[in-house]
Amino acid sequence: MIQQESQLKVADNTGAKKVKCFKVLGGSRRRYATVGDVIVCSVRDVEPDSSVKKGDVVKAVIVRTRNDIHRKDGSTLRFDTNSCVIIDDKGNPKGTRIFGPIAREIRDRGFVKISSLAPEVI
């Protein structure tokens, strides 16, 4: 579960390393976000010569959470980190590569481009 003030790692090659969530999109008083939800966040830590700068406000989709993901078949899934992928206003990823596995729920939410760039979909 990701909420306001949560810090996430960035799982793409835009140059951002860490972001801080300050809004969960999808409802007027929505508190938590899980895998596949879109958040608005601020870039906190960047690599040199990156396409995003520190302090930039970006949209991101959550691809991994430490909290359990419960599936309809009864199985659960948990990752080691809270991670996201930075997207543009149309929902396409800003980076050209995605690092690490992502959950299958990303494709179900309509982010097909992100799931096709990922090396492994669990």
UniProtKB/Swiss-Prot annotation:
InterPro entries (UniProt xref): Ribosomal_uL14 (IPR000218), Ribosomal_uL14_bac-type (IPR005745), Ribosomal_uL14_CS (IPR019972), Ribosomal_uL14_sf (IPR036853)
Keyword line: Ribonucleoprotein, Ribosomal protein, RNA-binding, rRNA-binding
Gene Ontology terms, MF aspect: large ribosomal subunit rRNA binding; structural constituent of ribosome
One Pfam short name: Ribosomal_L14
PROSITE patterns: RIBOSOMAL_L14 (PS00049)
A single GO cellular-component term on record: cytosolic large ribosomal subunit
Gene Ontology BP annotations: translation
Keyword Ribonucleoprotein: yes
Keyword Transport: no
Quaternary structure and interacting proteins, as annotated: Part of the 50S ribosomal subunit. Forms a cluster with proteins L3 and L19. In the 70S ribosome, L14 and L19 interact and together make contacts with the 16S rRNA in bridges B5 and B8.
The family this protein is said to belong to: Belongs to the universal ribosomal protein uL14 family.
HAMAP family (UniProt xref): Ribosomal_uL14
Function: Binds to 23S rRNA. Forms part of two intersubunit bridges in the 70S ribosome.
Protein name: Large ribosomal subunit protein uL14
The species this protein was found in: Chlamydia trachomatis serovar D (strain ATCC VR-885 / DSM 19411 / UW-3/Cx)
